[in-house]
Amino acid sequence: MIGRLRGIILEKQPPLVLLEVGGVGYEVHMPMTCFYELPESGKEATVFTHFVVREDAQLLYGFNNKQERTLFKELIKTNGVGPKLALAILSGMSAQQFVNAVEREEPAALVKLPGIGKKTAERLIVEMKDRFKGLHGDLFTPAADLVLTSPASPATDDAEQEAVAALVALGYKPQEASRMVSKIARPDASSETLIREALRAAL
């Protein structure tokens, strides 16, 4: 199916990006750690995609590189982990941070993510660690955690509302999302900055 898209970014509404390719607009769901690295609207971007078909929808998930996509595909093979939860996991921490948490057997780092309880965290560590034995060489080098940066978008009046909506889409309850954003909100912050700082504070 669709494995890669290259086109112009029409809209960025975390965690969704609308990418125009050949006159067709594709809605792509992206982990926030990948979303932060996208260029601004109107610029060209390339995303590696995974196509998911459900009874009620057909969804595209996008990533900045093949390694992140591979990790996402391995995550959704885990019992009890669907695309939405996998997206939340890779939004709350970088792919490298997740790999590190699994290899160091740190369930406490995972239970801080929305939708991850103790049993799910332990199951992820057991199942993913076994898969990493064959995949790690193709995923990430055992280096320091990835440092993700992107130019901040101009602040908007509804930046806080956009940030809350994005956190809810990632699995946080509305009241919890509002509380997370209010703790770090400031007038000059863009929605992307608020989301990034809220997720960082949650960990």
Curated annotation (Swiss-Prot):
Q: Record's GO cellular component, any one?
A: cytoplasm
Subcellular location, principal? cytoplasm
Name the protein family.
Answer: Belongs to the RuvA family.
Q: Please indicate which superkingdom the organism of origin belongs to.
A: Bacteria
InterPro entries membership: DNA_helicase_Holl-junc_RuvA_I, Hlx-hairpin-Hlx_DNA-bd_motif, NA-bd_OB-fold, RuvA, RuvA_2-like, RuvA_C, RuvA_C_sf
Q: Name one GO molecular function term.
A: four-way junction helicase activity
Q: Where does the record place the region Flexible linker?
A: 143-154
* Subunit: Homotetramer. Forms an RuvA(8)-RuvB(12)-Holliday junction (HJ) complex. HJ DNA is sandwiched between 2 RuvA tetramers; dsDNA enters through RuvA and exits via RuvB. An RuvB hexamer assembles on each DNA strand where it exits the tetramer. Each RuvB hexamer is contacted by two RuvA subunits (via domain III) on 2 adjacent RuvB subunits; this complex drives branch migration. In the full resolvosome a probable DNA-RuvA(4)-RuvB(12)-RuvC(2) complex forms which resolves the HJ.
State the residue spans of region: Domain II: 65-142
Q: What is this protein called?
A: Holliday junction branch migration complex subunit RuvA
Keyword list, A-Z: Cytoplasm, DNA damage, DNA recombination, DNA repair, DNA-binding
Q: Subcellular location, in the record's words?
A: Cytoplasm
Query: Which region ranges are annotated with the description Domain I?
Result: 1-64
- Function, in words: The RuvA-RuvB-RuvC complex processes Holliday junction (HJ) DNA during genetic recombination and DNA repair, while the RuvA-RuvB complex plays an important role in the rescue of blocked DNA replication forks via replication fork reversal (RFR). RuvA specifically binds to HJ cruciform DNA, conferring on it an open structure. The RuvB hexamer acts as an ATP-dependent pump, pulling dsDNA into and through the RuvAB complex. HJ branch migration allows RuvC to scan DNA until it finds its consensus sequence, where it cleaves and resolves the cruciform DNA.
- Provide the domain comment: Has three domains with a flexible linker between the domains II and III and assumes an 'L' shape. Domain III is highly mobile and contacts RuvB.
- Region Domain III: list its residue ranges: 155-203
The regions listed as transmembrane in this protein's record are none
Q: Native species of this protein?
A: Citrobacter koseri (strain ATCC BAA-895 / CDC 4225-83 / SGSC4696)
Q: Which GO terms are recorded in the biological process aspect for this UniProt protein?
A: DNA recombination; DNA repair
Give the disulfide map.
none
